[in-house]
Amino acid sequence: MAKEIVGYLKLQVKGGEAKPAPPVGPALGSKGLNIMEFCKQFNARTQDKQGQILPVLITIYQDKTFDFVIKTPPAAASIMQKAGISKGSSESNRNKVGVITWSAIKEIAASKMEDLNTINLESATKMIAGTARSMGVTIKE
């Protein structure tokens, strides 16, 4: 018989850098999960993605065990990395903070395809382009 699921938990943690300190510790501790076990497993599975922000979906079972799925880095983080900026614009329609090419947008869209709600690369590219524009990043040919 399958384990009974009692809840889900979403976190964003830097790859290879999960520690029992906030935000990981309090979030897992409040659900009664083994914090160190999660940190060890997460760090082992994300050694190759050191320093990248990674969304994690944790499935919590009734016997206080867990499974987790690591998603691809957020589109905004990928855009900031490709555009070479530290943060987006607070007034994206007035202040442009960086420039990114369409080829970089397509590359980000292709890497995020599994997490986006589309099966069409063109639609995914438009989603990523919209994120870039809302951050104040100009897209050039």
Curated annotation (Swiss-Prot):
Signal peptide: none annotated. Keywords: Methylation, Ribonucleoprotein, Ribosomal protein, RNA-binding, rRNA-binding. One or more lysine residues are methylated. It comes from the Bacteria. Part of the ribosomal stalk of the 50S ribosomal subunit. Interacts with L10 and the large rRNA to form the base of the stalk. L10 forms an elongated spine to which L12 dimers bind in a sequential fashion forming a multimeric L10(L12)X complex. SMART domains: RL11. GO terms for biological process: translation. This is Large ribosomal subunit protein uL11. Forms part of the ribosomal stalk which helps the ribosome interact with GTP-bound translation factors. Pfam families: Ribosomal_L11 (PF00298), Ribosomal_L11_N (PF03946). InterPro entries: Ribosomal_uL11 (IPR000911), Ribosomal_uL11_bac-typ (IPR006519), Ribosomal_uL11_C (IPR020783), Ribosomal_uL11_C_sf (IPR036769), Ribosomal_uL11_CS (IPR020785), Ribosomal_uL11_N (IPR020784), Ribosomal_uL11_N_sf (IPR036796). Belongs to the universal ribosomal protein uL11 family. GO terms for cellular component: cytosolic large ribosomal subunit. One of its GO terms (molecular function) is large ribosomal subunit rRNA binding.
